[in-house]
From Swiss-Prot:
Name recorded for this polypeptide: Cardiolipin synthase A
NCBIfam families named in the record: bac_cardiolipin
Membrane topology term: Multi-pass membrane protein
Organism in which the protein naturally occurs: Pectobacterium carotovorum subsp. carotovorum (strain PC1)
Class of the enzyme per the UniProt entry, highest EC level: transferase
Species classification: Bacteria, Pseudomonadati, Pseudomonadota, Gammaproteobacteria, Enterobacterales
Gene: clsA
Amino acid sequence: MSTFYTVISWLLVFGYWLLIAGVTLRILMKRRAVPSAMAWLLVIYILPLVGIVAYLSFGELHLGKRRAERASKMWPSTAKWLRELKEYRRIFATENSEVASALFQLCERRQGVGGVKGNQLQLMTTFDDTIKALLRDIELARSNIEMVFYIWQPGGLVEQVSSSLIAAARRGVHCRILLDSAGSVQFFRQHHPELMRTAGIEVVEALKVNLFRAFLRRMDLRQHRKIILIDNRIAYTGSMNMVDPRFFKQDAGVGQWIDLMARIEGPVATTLGIIYCCDWEMETGKRLLPPPPDVNVMPFEQESGHTIQVIASGPGYPEEMIHQALLTSVYSARKQLIMTTPYFVPSDDLLHAICTAAQRGVDVSIIVPHKNDSVLVGWASRAFFTELLAAGVKIYQFKDGLLHTKSVLVDGQLSLVGTVNLDMRSLWLNFEITLVIDDAGFGSDLACVQEDYIARSRLLNATQWQNRPYWQRIVERLFYFFSPLL
């Protein structure tokens, strides 16, 4: 009997090390950044069983078999739709400013569609203003309303949006809502989905979360886009979730969330529409294709119109697209670069680009929250401050709430606004959306918003930062090492 137990023990030991060796080999064979690979290996060898389960659940980017099959089926029809869209040559910009030309060229070559001109664009800096405009647009909607959000939390003015959507559906407007399962977990636990469905609204839970699915698909892959489409000609996007900041996470100790949204009228709504349709088909298997731009209602030739390029990122979209776009934007800066983000955990390449911009004389400012709702990300962000300050980057810590706006302004001309945080999750993983605007007028509007953020922030003093307690440096470096996994 003792021999039997000895054999079993050796088999278990052999299987244990074989499993670790197999996962190690899998990590090494995957084409990934060295810091990410090293961080995963450290976790696996310090906490083997936990590390292996974590890696198999979160370490590799895969949609799952069903979504992958749907994605492969929808691309031919999507590609055909894009080819037909390109026949509307008058909607595409043929010239860009010097600072924006490299980025627009990159986007056109990688995504197959260039920047679209003739759009009217309005910045919304408060939740109340955004909801007021949205309620008016929903009331006037005649054909369709589509929405996708990471978080939808009932309460406050959000109830008015729900009521307005129900009224629109009852008068014959096709309404579809796509919400991330993890972000909108409270919404799906309440009666609101059934109330909307009874009224005729299609409500879909995207990327459902449960333990069984952890072995079929990466569970921290999230639908992080925020898009509203109305009658295929009006669109909203930006950093705002469908939550009233007066009631959202008020026990987190970070204050109200501060967001930025853009309201767009024009042909670029069609580009946002095809992205929404792809997301919808990937989740439901139902095909939707937006109609082409209506030349009778969209003023393509207006001199005041904005040229906008849409960047969609996530599984199934051009790899590293948003990361390349950010790098191109930073390297294009000649005079000034202003970035706002709630979560700052950049890649080594992006960190190097930002520092290099400051070192070659560009006035670089980064605005981040003073208090963060994510303790892990907050500590990891601080680990980058020393290198940034040494390069001459100005770091502003926003003190009037949790600054959730994601924006980049280059030389007052090139603007990027959307859902992308400057962290690994947004850069490499989640479904995200970004608007690229080549326009000095819009750049001036965005600069005013960013200057207001700076006025409500504290400039980080390099000398005081160097004198912070030693224990804080240790914690920062610890989280810095694991930053590729955050």
